[in-house]
């Protein structure tokens, strides 16, 4: 899993030549355990150059090998000749080792000694399906996976009639085929349903250990693309392929558990287990509070920026939602003494009032869909990651932050014990201090509201909206200290990763700008001019027929008005495309990758929306039969 965010593969055969010029099949375990690909052809942030290109792959035995298309696939880590990490898998594995070590040390305070603690994740994969013929007729979809222009359909999702609706038969056939392929590869998919937007769907798996779940999600996205074409679909994993309807995310349901099957985010039946539950919940909240800017940077991208903050996705401000019950427990704990009972209620019953339906067991928290990091009963749901990403980036940041915070908790408890405090008193005092300190990150209200944005700034939370500047969080002293002390990433590796992130951001915006410029000048403007000529011919024929008759002015008023409006939009599009090209040239002259990314964000990206506004207006004016691209009503409602 190189830093492209995708998977990469290399196929080797077991054929070996012999002295008599024949060949034999020779199986070598060494070839499976270690490989030697070119490391300079992948993004490396300067760690590898063409003249020093050697890299190594090493078998990851924690993730299952699988057979696809008659080949044995082996998940591997990828490092440079000098040992620097060049992939997303290796630091994720290191973060799991860090959380295992830190969590077991904290559990020892409670007299629990598991052999292993692991982080689990269940990534809910959202996606759109588009008919392949329509997809092929949209160069913007083919090249960027999002529509760079297109007016909203008169009907989209306003009736709320798609979510959990009946799955269209053609889509259902695709889903069945996809699930069969997933089971063949060991991907434990479990739930499928319609999502909110037209032609939007979701596939959710059973929870697995973080590294394995991430591998399976990467494999799932690859299989989805392959299987969709069998059914004359194209799957869109972009976070915001269509304006005016919901985007797609990858909600990562994250938890921690022991090898004994104990979920560390589930309350127990006695005082000690409940104190353990509060300890891990509070330390997670504390980690999110301290590293909220880093967690936002871990999910930031040019594509996810279109989704975050819209009224269907979490805001671009990291906060935690705990629900009424857990919030009350922490508030009570903060103001209690060590002698007070620690109680966490079990699920409550809800009787619906008629006998045919059984009593429902309610979770101990409600759901706040506007929160990017919500406690949902026995896990935290990280809703900010985008649908197209390798979720390893978000998970390694979260794992590392929580591991480092657990290390700090252990040190703080031991410091109080060294002062003569008992272990339980020390745990109480540290947790109470953490609850008080981390209060700014807790928010149970509407994350979409403008009031929350103002309040978040007052609380000192990171409110940065520029993606290139969000990446600076990786190189803050506290982030470097956290990653290096947990052994997840070195400062050099962090700097290289940021170089890659800035470069990817630049190229994403650059490609979109070039595609939109091409569509504007070669597709839209010629059609608009042609329709303008039709209107002018109509005006000329009216003039020829009615001459100076006063009726001519009345009858030609609307065509003349349309000609003026179309001419205005044509001039505006041409002017803004030229300005965008100049802004791109100016940005390209910058040599520093960070400064170039900032220039693309500030000076190039705004033109994408400005040009689109004019083209979308033209779409409503130009003859439908002349318009060169499939419209939203076709893309979203032809199934």
Go through the PLM ranges and name each one.
Residues 2-237, 242-250, 255-499:
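Glycine-rich, acidic/polar active-site loops that bind/position phosphate-bearing ligands
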Residues 434-639:
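C-terminal amphipathic alpha-helical interaction region
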């Amino acid at each position: 899993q190189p830093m492209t965010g995708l998977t990469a593969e290399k196929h080797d055969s077991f054929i070996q030549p012999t002295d008599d010029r024949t060949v034999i099949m020779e199986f070598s375990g060494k070839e499976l355990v270690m490989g030697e690909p070119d490391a300079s052809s992948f993004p490396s942030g300067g760690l590898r150059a063409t003249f020093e290109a050697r890299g190594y792959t090493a078998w990851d035995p924690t993730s299952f090998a699988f057979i696809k298309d008659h080949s044995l696939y082996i998940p591997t880590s990828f490092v440079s000749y000098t040992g620097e990490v060049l992939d997303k898998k290796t630091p994720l594995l290191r973060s799991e080792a860090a959380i295992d070590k830190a969590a077991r040390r904290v559990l020892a305070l409670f007299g629990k000694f598991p052999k292993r603690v692991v982080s689990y994740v269940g990534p809910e994969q959202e996606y759109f399906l588009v008919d392949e013929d329509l997809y092929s007729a949209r160069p913007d979809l083919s090249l960027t996976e999002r529509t760079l222009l297109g007016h909203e359909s008169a009907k989209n999702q306003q009736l709320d009639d798609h979510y959990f609706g009946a799955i269209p038969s053609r889509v259902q056939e695709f889903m069945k085929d996809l699930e069969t392929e997933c089971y063949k590869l060991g991907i434990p998919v479990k739930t499928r349903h319609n999502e909110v937007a037209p032609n939007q769907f979701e596939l959710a798996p059973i929870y697995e250990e973080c590294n394995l779940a991430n591998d399976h999600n990467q494999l799932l996205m690859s299989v989805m693309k392959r299987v969709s074409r069998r059914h004359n679909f194209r799957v869109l994993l972009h976070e915001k392929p269509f304006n005016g309807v919901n985007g797609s995310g990858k909600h990562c349901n994250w938890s921690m558990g022991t090898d004994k099957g104990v979920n560390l985010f589930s309350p127990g039946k006695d005082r000690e287990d409940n104190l353990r539950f509060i300890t891990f919940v509070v330390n997670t909240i504390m980690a999110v509070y301290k590293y909220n800017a880093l967690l936002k940077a871990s999910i930031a991208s040019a594509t996810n920026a279109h989704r975050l903050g819209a009224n269907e996705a979490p805001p671009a401000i990291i906060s935690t939602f705990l629900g009424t019950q857990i919030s009350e427990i922490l508030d009570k704990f903060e103001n209690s003494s060590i002698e007070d009972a620690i109680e966490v209620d079990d699920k409550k019953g809800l009787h619906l009032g008629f006998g045919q339906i059984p009593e429902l067991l309610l979770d101990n928290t409600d759901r706040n869909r506007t929160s990017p990091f919500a406690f949902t009963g026995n896990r935290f749901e990280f809703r900010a990651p985008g649908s197209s990403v390798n979720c390893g980036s978000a998970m390694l940041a979260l794992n590392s932050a929580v591991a480092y915070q657990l290390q700090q908790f252990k040190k703080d408890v031991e410091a109080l014990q060294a002062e003569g405090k008992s272990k339980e008193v020390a745990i109480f005092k540290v947790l109470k201090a953490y609850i008080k300190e981390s209060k700014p990150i807790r928010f149970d209200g509407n994350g979409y509201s403008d009031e929350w944005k103002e309040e978040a700034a007052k609380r000192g939370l990171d409110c940065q909206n520029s993606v290139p500047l969000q990446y600076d969080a990786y190189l803050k002293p506290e982030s470097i200290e956290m990653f290096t002390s947990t052994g997840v990433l070195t400062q050099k590796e962090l700097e290289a990763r940021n170089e890659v992130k800035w470069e990817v951001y630049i190229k994403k915006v650059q490609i979109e700008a070039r595609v939109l410029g091409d569509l504007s000048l070669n597709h839209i403007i010629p059609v608009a001019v042609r329709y303008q000529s039709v209107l002018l011919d109509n005006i000329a024929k009216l003039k020829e027929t009615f001459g100076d008759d006063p009726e001519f002015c009345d009858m030609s008023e609307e065509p003349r008005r349309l000609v003026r409006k179309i001419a205005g939009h044509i001039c505006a599009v041409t002017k803004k495309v030229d300005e965008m090209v100049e802004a791109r040239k100016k940005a390209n002259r910058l040599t520093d990758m960070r400064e170039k990314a900032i220039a693309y964000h500030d000076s190039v990206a705004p033109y994408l929306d400005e040009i689109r506004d004019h083209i979308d207006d033209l779409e409503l004016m130009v003859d439908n039969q002349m318009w060169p691209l499939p419209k939203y009503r076709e893309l979203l409602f032809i199934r």
